[in-house]
């Protein structure tokens, strides 16, 4: 909106620069989240929209009165900042907003069910995965129709591994959406544990998206160019800004949780950025914390079903370390450090090819 008005109509050249509009979007989303979140917290407490706490984690029972669904606020702030600062005629921007809203809506349904039933179960797995699958499939098909190439790239290599057939690519992208959204959802179990790794991952992906959309940088760095994708940089930075605003209230001890409304939206948008920038494989490194958390659950369930033995004291693995006596803050900060280092290594792949 501001972009179309100030650059398209008044011809203010400053608004033609992605970096300026992305920075502006960052601060708009940050301050809007800071402003709206206290009001949301008061409303959520009045409505008793509190996060049901699992009985298997007795140390978290003191969090039972903490309101949830804070993700609605930072998703809303991101959309407002994107509408103001990004070009809404860009399909990658529109699809990014659709991903944020769609995945957040599924998360909202799950949160609402948990609050109504006063347990941690939420929607049935069949309904939840069904809704996520349909949404992921629609976005993946639209990306294919847009003409996004289907080459599969590996980090630190100049050339793609191979070109996927269209149907295989769509199926692969759906898998990336589903796995990433649920991985972030599993990670969101401690104060700030999902927020900061998401910030690191989004910052890294934002750089890749910016390079992919810039003809000179992509040529210099031997990075695959994706026409028009650079505009998504504005939306990504807006989401990072809103996450910093959310973290202001989510740091330990948290005043609000993001809920599935936030974690599914984050995971879906991270997956979307990875797909359009051809970083599906590198996402394993950038989202290392999410991968480890998910693997711990898979291994725990698999081990118990096959051997009747548990590999960890509790899964996801952040609870395992809590059971071993680590303070919550120690688990959180150490996971942040791992995430930061993983993303620094991932960024090296831009130059080391």
From Swiss-Prot:
Its EC number is 2.7.8.13. GO terms for cellular component: plasma membrane. It comes from the Bacteria. The chain crosses the membrane at residues 24-44, 66-86, 88-108, 129-149, 160-180, 192-212, 229-249, 256-276, 281-301, 330-350. It holds the Pfam family Glycos_transf_4. It comes from Helicobacter pylori (strain HPAG1). HAMAP family: MraY. NCBIfam families: mraY (TIGR00445). Its cofactor is Mg(2+). GO terms for molecular function: metal ion binding; phospho-N-acetylmuramoyl-pentapeptide-transferase activity; UDP-N-acetylmuramoyl-L-alanyl-D-glutamyl-meso-2,6-diaminopimelyl-D-alanyl-D-alanine:undecaprenyl-phosphate transferase activity. It is a multi-pass membrane protein. Pathway: Cell wall biogenesis; peptidoglycan biosynthesis. Belongs to the glycosyltransferase 4 family. MraY subfamily. GO terms for biological process: cell division; cell wall organization; peptidoglycan biosynthetic process; regulation of cell shape. It is found in: Cell inner membrane. This is Phospho-N-acetylmuramoyl-pentapeptide-transferase. It catalyses: UDP-N-acetyl-alpha-D-muramoyl-L-alanyl-gamma-D-glutamyl-meso-2,6-diaminopimeloyl-D-alanyl-D-alanine + di-trans,octa-cis-undecaprenyl phosphate = di-trans,octa-cis-undecaprenyl diphospho-N-acetyl-alpha-D-muramoyl-L-alanyl-D-glutamyl-meso-2,6-diaminopimeloyl-D-alanyl-D-alanine + UMP.
């Amino acid at each position: 909106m501001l972009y179309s008005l100030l650059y398209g109509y008044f011809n203010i050249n400053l608004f033609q620069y992605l970096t300026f509009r992305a920075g502006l979007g960052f601060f708009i989303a940050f301050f809007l989240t800071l402003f709206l979140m206290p009001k949301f917290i008061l409303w959520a407490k009045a409505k008793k929209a509190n996060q049901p706490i699992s009985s298997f984690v007795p140390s978290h029972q003191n969090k039972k009165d903490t309101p949830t669904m804070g993700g609605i606020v930072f998703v809303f702030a991101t959309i407002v900042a994107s509408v103001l600062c990004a070009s809404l005629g860009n399909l990658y921007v529109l699809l990014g907003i659709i991903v944020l809203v769609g995945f957040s809506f599924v998360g909202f349904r799950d949160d609402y069910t948990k609050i109504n039933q006063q347990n941690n179960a939420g929607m049935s797995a069949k309904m939840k995965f069904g809704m996520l699958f349909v949404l992921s499939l629609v976005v993946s098909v639209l990306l294919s129709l847009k003409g996004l190439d289907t080459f599969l790239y590996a980090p630190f290599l100049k050339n793609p591994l191979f070109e996927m057939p269209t149907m295989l690519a769509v199926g692969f992208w759906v898998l990336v959406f589903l796995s990433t959204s649920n991985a972030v959802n599993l990670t969101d179990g401690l104060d700030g544990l999902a927020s900061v790794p998401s910030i690191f991952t989004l910052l890294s992906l934002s750089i890749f998206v910016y390079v992919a959309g810039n003809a000179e940088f992509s040529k210099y760095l031997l990075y695959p160019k994706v026409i028009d994708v650079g505009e998504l940089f504005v939306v990504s930075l807006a989401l990072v800004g809103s996450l910093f605003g959310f973290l202001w209230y989510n740091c330990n001890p948290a005043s609000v949780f993001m809920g599935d409304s936030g974690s599914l939206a984050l995971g879906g948008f991270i997956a979307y950025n990875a797909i359009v920038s051809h970083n599906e494989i590198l996402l394993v490194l950038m989202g290392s914390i999410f991968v480890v958390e998910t693997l711990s659950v898979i291994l725990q369930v698999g081990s118990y079903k096959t051997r009747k033995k548990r590999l960890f004291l509790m899964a996801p693995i952040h609870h395992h370390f809590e059971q071993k006596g680590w303070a919550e803050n120690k688990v959180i900060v150490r996971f942040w450090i791992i995430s930061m280092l993983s993303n620094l290594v991932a960024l090296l792949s831009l130059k080391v090819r």
